[in-house]
């Protein structure tokens, strides 16, 4: 391994750690394309990214827990279904051809941009209904209702589409499958699904997501390690950088407006999807 590659891996790890704390993703959305660009096989990129994510997510979640922003019961409810499906994802990753693995990863990024926008519209609709009820003098609103309001100030269950238990199982299962299949912690699907199905604010979804990623990434990495796909030295370098980056970003997240965090998350997904589609095309035409 050259000095240049070593520095690139360390810098990428720090950047992924910063994204983990700010956006609730393990960093796989950045690390997988980077490792593919460094000529690692897609299945190795997926597996090694998972190892890095374990270290990064543990670092960020410990910091969130110390600051009182992490609900362990919520993490457990979403995380345990992910343990089983992560093994399924790790198995499928070894079967798919490289170009198909990258293509479906890019489609996943696009899907998440759409899900976040859907949730944004639903939240706006619910807030408008509450505002209309206040103007009509509905009981229970009174002097304590102030605008603008947050998700947590909406009426109970008004912001939840499905039963919470079902929503947690569905969210965790999807996250685990993606963790094993694509080498992501699952945050790219957990954040929008928590917002969409559980009615969480984006900051709460991010903090819970990072905690769940600890579980999903460990499970997925174990599955890949059993198949010999993990590059341990590369993963530890990335993880060391991620540990530092996550400590910084988790301290700053509570100070940022939800609108800025949401815009940053969607912008990142859009840029990465373009790169991943290009990589998929290159793999396809080169056989």
Task: Tell what function each PLM region has.
Residues 193-211, 216:
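Transmembrane helical segments that form the transport core of multi-pass membrane transport proteins
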Residues 23-31, 183-193:
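Transmembrane helix boundary and interhelical junction motifs in multipass membrane proteins
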Residues 48-63:
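Transmembrane alpha-helices of multi-pass small-molecule transport proteins
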Residues 49-53, 209-213, 234-239:
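Short hydrophobic/aromatic, small-residue-rich stretches within specific transmembrane helices
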Residues 42-47, 206-210:
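Small-residue hotspots at the loop-to-helix junctions and early N-terminal turns
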Residues 1-16, 34-38, 42, 63-178, ...:
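Juxtamembrane transmembrane-helix boundary motif
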Residues 17-29, 198-199:
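Single transmembrane alpha-helix segments in multi-pass membrane proteins
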